[in-house]
Amino acid sequence: MAKNNAVAGFNALNGVELNLFTTDELKAIHYATMDVLMNPGVQVSDPEARQIFKENGCEVDEKTNVVKIPEYLVRRALQLAPSRFVLWGRDKKFNTVQECGGKVHWTCFGTGVKMCKYQDGKYVTVDSVEQDIADIAKLCDWAENIDYFSLPVSARDIAGQGAQDVHETLTPIANTAKHYHHIDPVGENVEYYRDIVTAYYGGDEEEARKKPIFSMLLCPTSPLELSVNACQVIIKGARFGMPVNVLSMAMSGGSSPVYLAGTLVTHNAEVLAGITLAQLTVPGTKVWYGSSTTTFDLKKGTAPVGSPELGLISASVAKLAQFYGLPAFVAGTOSDAKIPDNQAGHEKTMTCLLPALAGANTLYGAGMLELGMTFSMEQLVIDNDIIKMTKKALQGVPVNEETLAVESIQKVGIGNNFLALKQTRQLVNYPSDPMLIDRRMFGDWAAAGSKDLASAAHDKVVDVLKNHVVKPIDADILKDMQAVVDRADKAFRGM
């Protein structure tokens, strides 16, 4: 099923790798999905999208809006979708390559509606506002293990007052030089997003297409629906040259079968339907195979994201994406904890490591708490350390002539140590070295003030927000970008 330039199930990790399926099992999921795409099919609410499907050979029922997508169209779409594309940052040092079987990347979670604020050991939750987005963007700009920025929370202070999603486009771009991934786009406003990015490039739309500093995420409605908004984000994103992330949020036992394999079939059908629409609209559109799929807790009535099932599903999706030769964007580093505590540390490490070992190209979840509803800047700083240590684990144990170190062992001999060895001094940074996770003995820790991890993280947040400098946008360019937001606000208010 893989493309000619990709190998099914291939993972470019040099160290440890997690394999969950045989090739036959991946094929079984694929063929089950093809059955579902024809019976019952997918409900497509957008007339323009239905017409695109119809013109390309799909059976369309205009009474029910159900589209039946044959396998040959899916295969053609998968051949057209690129296995590799670059996400540009405003500073090219932050460019990241999304590639099937390539490096694992991390981004922050989105989109929550609350902030967990920390001060003097106390926690409060408040509605998120536009300034929170700016602050988190600055923090992510600093965080070395956050590769690009995803919309973490919504600007609830603007809701009902202006074009909220357009504000949520400029504010991140202005406050981080890393690539911006919009997780809450509105189909009818994609033109404004394009105009903001084009203004950044001095009005050069072709340059904006070649060097996308902006991308979008949309979610099918489980089970098996593509809403008008989702379709318009796909169609317009494809036409404007924006990378598009088709991300299912199926819930096992709720909006998909209780069996995880059946959930993967539902998930797969939704994502492949969206990817097929993108390729039918503009062949070669850059797409992610996305997942925030998890289980439905039948006893609590919630959709946990700190569960082992979330980690397993995300790892499974990574393998499906590799099977299709596509970059995978999955939930990971996630938690159901309400504050940065022991539960958060355990759940985030578990849900981070599983999909990373499976070779997902991007994990999103950093900074997130409370089943995805709440964001904590202190947790983001802690997650920056968790991610750094995960990266070290992914390296595995390299075995070669240098690392076997026979000459060093013979030189040091019996009963001595390796501390004074030149090789040891040269590789002082070789062991894992977290920034805040504390490895001192109790006495030294107590003498330094006995700060717990959350307190240390809070100090770092304060320091970064005060002192970190983000690469600025030229004042005249920023003025032109702001003019697009002002235009959108006027349209929203009917002026």
Curated annotation (Swiss-Prot):
<comment type="similarity">
    <text>Belongs to the trimethylamine methyltransferase family.</text>
</comment>
<keyword id="KW-0484">Methanogenesis</keyword>
<keyword id="KW-0489">Methyltransferase</keyword>
<dbReference type="Pfam" id="PF06253">
    <property type="entry name" value="MTTB"/>
</dbReference>
<dbReference type="InterPro" id="IPR038601">
    <property type="entry name" value="MttB-like_sf"/>
</dbReference>
<dbReference type="GO" id="GO:0032259">
    <property type="term" value="P:methylation"/>
</dbReference>
<dbReference type="GO" id="GO:0015948">
    <property type="term" value="P:methanogenesis"/>
</dbReference>
<dbReference type="InterPro" id="IPR012740">
    <property type="entry name" value="MttB_Methanosar"/>
</dbReference>
<comment type="subunit">
    <text>Can form a complex with MttC.</text>
</comment>
<comment type="pathway">
    <text>One-carbon metabolism; methanogenesis from trimethylamine.</text>
</comment>
<keyword id="KW-0808">Transferase</keyword>
<dbReference type="GO" id="GO:0043834">
    <property type="term" value="F:trimethylamine methyltransferase activity"/>
</dbReference>
<comment type="function">
    <text>Catalyzes the transfer of a methyl group from trimethylamine to the corrinoid cofactor of MttC.</text>
</comment>
<protein>
    <recommendedName>
        <fullName>Trimethylamine methyltransferase MttB1</fullName>
        <ecNumber>2.1.1.250</ecNumber>
    </recommendedName>
</protein>
<keyword id="KW-0669">Pyrrolysine</keyword>
<dbReference type="InterPro" id="IPR010426">
    <property type="entry name" value="MTTB_MeTrfase"/>
</dbReference>
